[in-house]
UniProtKB/Swiss-Prot annotation:
Entry GO terms, CC: cytosolic large ribosomal subunit
Listed InterPro entries: Ribosomal_uL13 (IPR005822), Ribosomal_uL13_bac-type (IPR005823), Ribosomal_uL13_sf (IPR036899)
Subunit structure of this chain's protein: Part of the 50S ribosomal subunit.
Assigned keywords, A-Z: Ribonucleoprotein, Ribosomal protein
PANTHER family the record matches: LARGE RIBOSOMAL SUBUNIT PROTEIN UL13M, RIBOSOMAL PROTEIN L13
Cited CDD domains: Ribosomal_L13
SUPFAM superfamilies (UniProt xref): Ribosomal protein L13
Species the sequence originates in: Halorhodospira halophila (strain DSM 244 / SL1) (Ectothiorhodospira halophila (strain DSM 244 / SL1))
Lineage: Bacteria, Pseudomonadati, Pseudomonadota, Gammaproteobacteria, Chromatiales
Family per record: Belongs to the universal ribosomal protein uL13 family.
Protein name: Large ribosomal subunit protein uL13
Family annotation (Pfam families): Ribosomal_L13
S-adenosyl-L-methionine recorded as keyword: no
Length: 142
């Protein structure tokens, strides 16, 4: 008996809809990353993208515990000397609320080419509307 290894052409991908209203950021992100990677499937193979598509709505209503809204900072560098920049969670939520979930999930994915390909299957929207009705995403309760 041989160990089964999934092939990219044989992978069955589904679409799921997740409502982020009043969900904790880290707990939601870990479950989304798990499903994007395909680890919930019996045909999971580490070198094959076997994950599903995930559409997250109401990203602006995500919940954070403790004082993270005020204390947590997101850092980046412009590439110029002294170009370190930062924004608090409150500022990021005000400008681009979907980036909170995208950033949390990105940190939980593999840091390689396959991880970047898996992240393209994550669609995050700040409001209640999304553009993927034609794919008929199934509601997923996390």
């Amino acid at each position: 008996m041989k160990t089964y290894s999934a092939k990219p052409a044989e992978v069955q991908r589904d679409w799921y809809l997740v409502d982020a209203t009043d969900k904790t950021l880290g707990r939601l992100a870990s479950e989304v990353a798990h499903r994007l990677r395909g680890k919930h499937k019996p045909v999971f193979t580490p070198h094959v993208d076997a994950g599903d598509y995930i559409v997250v709505i109401n990203a602006d209503k995500i919940r954070l515990t403790g004082r993270k809204e005020r204390d947590k900072q997101y850092f980046w560098h412009t590439g110029f000397p002294g170009g370190i920049k930062s924004r608090s969670v409150a500022e990021v939520r005000e400008r681009h609320p979907e980036r909170l979930i995208e950033s949390a999930v990105r940190g939980m994915m593999p840091k390689n080419r396959l991880g970047r390909a898996m992240l393209k299957k994550l669609k995050v929207y700040a409001g209640n509307e999304h553009r993927h009705h034609a794919q008929q995403p199934q509601p997923l309760e996390l």
